[in-house]
């Protein structure tokens, strides 16, 4: 053992020990040589397990020659195919004996190509007018010569839906499967379909017998059609009921309008009309229309039980001016006859009030006064009128 590899005793606490390497370059060169120039050695000198030096006894440790626990012998392998042997968890391997496994082993070992999973609907015949063809890559699609459509969906799967599924989803119909055009993804198939449309002229019910189809499958489209008709009837009834309610509402509005017109006083006929001919024509077209007033696109909107002339739909207007006010229009001083006042009014009514006579300086002829002479007179009038409010001044 190398003495340098022996661990040195621990120094006492509180002391330090310094180790000095004598030949560092020689030891480093030896390490490089041992790695770069390894010496040949026998495998026997290495610490290896015993199974490393022994050949395998059988093929049980190899994937290529694995055997079945039931005693079956492996059959010949096929190039390019998947080898299928009976698994250890198969119930058949537990029930069969050694002799039966040896006889049935090669028959069950077979290879198959990749294909679609098995479907029960593949055994059913296609509906009348349908044809199944394949693309260049082996993908199948279906042609309907009656409706002249092309789809990836199998029409037999739609017919094979259970009846309880139809009851849970009544809106699903036989034609609800989305039909995607083949011309978008497969242009060549669209041209091929045009050539195959000629076959549709020779199709007839005799060429496509339906006796082989089960009765349950044929009743599904009938049930779907019946439910669709019932839904259409319900929608039609709702539309009719809504139309009847609109008509009754319109009649009620017309009756209310007639009642309000009868309650109108007769004096309103003598009032000045405001665009009554044009308004009555438009209103007559609205009220006499048999359609919904909210749907005919008219510019008028009605409001229930409104007596405001600006918002009502009637052909009347409620007066807001007192009736006895208009009869006294002749007594009022308006701007129209203001220019005729000096000739029609009595000259005695133009004299100043009596209280001006008691004021100083007012015993002179007022007609001969100039504007400058009237200024002190106006000041006296202001002082007489503003005795209670002496703090106010005129500007």
Swiss-Prot record:
<keyword id="KW-0597">Phosphoprotein</keyword>
<dbReference type="GO" id="GO:0005737">
    <property type="term" value="C:cytoplasm"/>
</dbReference>
<dbReference type="InterPro" id="IPR051583">
    <property type="entry name" value="YAP1"/>
</dbReference>
<feature type="compositionally biased region" description="Polar residues">
    <location>
        <begin position="277"/>
        <end position="293"/>
    </location>
</feature>
<dbReference type="GO" id="GO:0048762">
    <property type="term" value="P:mesenchymal cell differentiation"/>
</dbReference>
<dbReference type="GO" id="GO:0032835">
    <property type="term" value="P:glomerulus development"/>
</dbReference>
<dbReference type="GO" id="GO:0000122">
    <property type="term" value="P:negative regulation of transcription by RNA polymerase II"/>
</dbReference>
<comment type="function">
    <text>Transcriptional coactivator which acts as a downstream regulatory target in the Hippo signaling pathway that plays a pivotal role in organ size control and tumor suppression by restricting proliferation and promoting apoptosis. The core of this pathway is composed of a kinase cascade wherein STK3/MST2 and STK4/MST1, in complex with its regulatory protein SAV1, phosphorylates and activates LATS1/2 in complex with its regulatory protein MOB1, which in turn phosphorylates and inactivates YAP1 oncoprotein and WWTR1/TAZ. WWTR1 enhances PAX8 and NKX2-1/TTF1-dependent gene activation.</text>
</comment>
<dbReference type="GO" id="GO:0031146">
    <property type="term" value="P:SCF-dependent proteasomal ubiquitin-dependent protein catabolic process"/>
</dbReference>
<keyword id="KW-0796">Tight junction</keyword>
<feature type="region of interest" description="Disordered">
    <location>
        <begin position="277"/>
        <end position="308"/>
    </location>
</feature>
<keyword id="KW-0804">Transcription</keyword>
<dbReference type="GO" id="GO:0045669">
    <property type="term" value="P:positive regulation of osteoblast differentiation"/>
</dbReference>
<dbReference type="GO" id="GO:0060395">
    <property type="term" value="P:SMAD protein signal transduction"/>
</dbReference>
<feature type="compositionally biased region" description="Polar residues">
    <location>
        <begin position="61"/>
        <end position="70"/>
    </location>
</feature>
<dbReference type="GO" id="GO:0005829">
    <property type="term" value="C:cytosol"/>
</dbReference>
<feature type="coiled-coil region">
    <location>
        <begin position="224"/>
        <end position="258"/>
    </location>
</feature>
<dbReference type="GO" id="GO:0005667">
    <property type="term" value="C:transcription regulator complex"/>
</dbReference>
<dbReference type="GO" id="GO:0060271">
    <property type="term" value="P:cilium assembly"/>
</dbReference>
<dbReference type="GO" id="GO:0003713">
    <property type="term" value="F:transcription coactivator activity"/>
</dbReference>
<protein>
    <recommendedName>
        <fullName>WW domain-containing transcription regulator protein 1</fullName>
    </recommendedName>
</protein>
<keyword id="KW-0805">Transcription regulation</keyword>
<dbReference type="GO" id="GO:0090090">
    <property type="term" value="P:negative regulation of canonical Wnt signaling pathway"/>
</dbReference>
<dbReference type="GO" id="GO:0060993">
    <property type="term" value="P:kidney morphogenesis"/>
</dbReference>
<dbReference type="GO" id="GO:0005634">
    <property type="term" value="C:nucleus"/>
</dbReference>
<dbReference type="GO" id="GO:1900182">
    <property type="term" value="P:positive regulation of protein localization to nucleus"/>
</dbReference>
<dbReference type="InterPro" id="IPR001202">
    <property type="entry name" value="WW_dom"/>
</dbReference>
<dbReference type="GO" id="GO:0003015">
    <property type="term" value="P:heart process"/>
</dbReference>
<keyword id="KW-0472">Membrane</keyword>
<dbReference type="GO" id="GO:0003714">
    <property type="term" value="F:transcription corepressor activity"/>
</dbReference>
<dbReference type="GO" id="GO:0001649">
    <property type="term" value="P:osteoblast differentiation"/>
</dbReference>
<feature type="region of interest" description="Required for interaction with PALS1">
    <location>
        <begin position="221"/>
        <end position="395"/>
    </location>
</feature>
<dbReference type="GO" id="GO:0045599">
    <property type="term" value="P:negative regulation of fat cell differentiation"/>
</dbReference>
<dbReference type="GO" id="GO:0060828">
    <property type="term" value="P:regulation of canonical Wnt signaling pathway"/>
</dbReference>
<dbReference type="Pfam" id="PF00397">
    <property type="entry name" value="WW"/>
</dbReference>
<keyword id="KW-1017">Isopeptide bond</keyword>
<dbReference type="GO" id="GO:0045944">
    <property type="term" value="P:positive regulation of transcription by RNA polymerase II"/>
</dbReference>
<feature type="domain" description="WW">
    <location>
        <begin position="124"/>
        <end position="157"/>
    </location>
</feature>
<keyword id="KW-0963">Cytoplasm</keyword>
<dbReference type="GO" id="GO:0006355">
    <property type="term" value="P:regulation of DNA-templated transcription"/>
</dbReference>
<keyword id="KW-1003">Cell membrane</keyword>
<dbReference type="GO" id="GO:0072307">
    <property type="term" value="P:regulation of metanephric nephron tubule epithelial cell differentiation"/>
</dbReference>
């Amino acid at each position: 053992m190398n003495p340098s590899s022996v661990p040195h005793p621990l120094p006492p606490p509180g002391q330090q020990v310094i180790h000095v390497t004598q030949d560092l370059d020689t030891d480093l060169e030896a390490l490089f040589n041992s790695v770069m120039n390894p010496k040949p050695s026998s495998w026997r000198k290495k610490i290896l397990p015993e199974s490393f030096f022994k050949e395998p006894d059988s093929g049980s440790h190899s994937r290529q020659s694995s055997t079945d626990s039931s005693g079956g012998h492996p059959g010949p392998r096929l190039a390019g195919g998947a080898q299928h042997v009976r698994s250890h968890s198969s119930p058949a391997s537990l029930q069969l004996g050694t002799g039966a496994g040896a006889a049935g082993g090669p028959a069950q070992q077979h290879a198959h190509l990749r294909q679609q999973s098995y479907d029960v609907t593949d055994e059913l015949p296609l509906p009348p007018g349908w044809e199944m063809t394949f693309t260049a890559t082996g993908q199948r699609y279906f042609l309907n010569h009656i409706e002249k459509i092309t789809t990836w969906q199998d029409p037999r799967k739609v017919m094979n839906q259970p009846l309880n599924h139809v009851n849970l989803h009544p809106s699903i119909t036989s034609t609800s499967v989305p039909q995607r055009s083949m011309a978008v993804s497969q242009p060549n198939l669209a041209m091929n379909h045009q050539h195959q449309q000629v076959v549709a002229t020779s199709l007839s019910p005799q060429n496509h017998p339906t006796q082989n189809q089960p009765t349950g499958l044929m009743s599904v489209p009938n049930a779907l059609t019946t439910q669709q008709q019932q839904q259409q009837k319900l929608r039609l009834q709702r539309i009719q009921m809504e139309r009847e309610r609109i008509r009754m509402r319109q009649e009620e509005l017309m009756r209310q309008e007639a009642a309000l017109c009868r309650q109108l006083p007769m004096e309103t006929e003598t009032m000045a009309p405001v665009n009554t001919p044009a308004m009555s024509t438009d209103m007559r077209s609205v009220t006499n229309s048999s359609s919904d007033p909210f749907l005919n696109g008219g510019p008028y909107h009605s409001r229930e039980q409104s007596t405001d002339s600006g918002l009502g739909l009637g052909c009347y207007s409620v007066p807001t001016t007192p009736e006895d006010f208009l009869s006294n229009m002749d007594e009022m001083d308006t701007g129209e006859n203001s220019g005729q006042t000096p000739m029609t009014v009595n000259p005695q009514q133009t004299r100043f009030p009596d209280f001006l006579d008691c004021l100083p300086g007012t015993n002179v002829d007022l007609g001969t006064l100039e504007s400058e002479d009237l200024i002190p007179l106006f000041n006296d009038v202001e002082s007489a009128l503003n005795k209670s409010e002496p703090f106010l001044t005129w500007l």
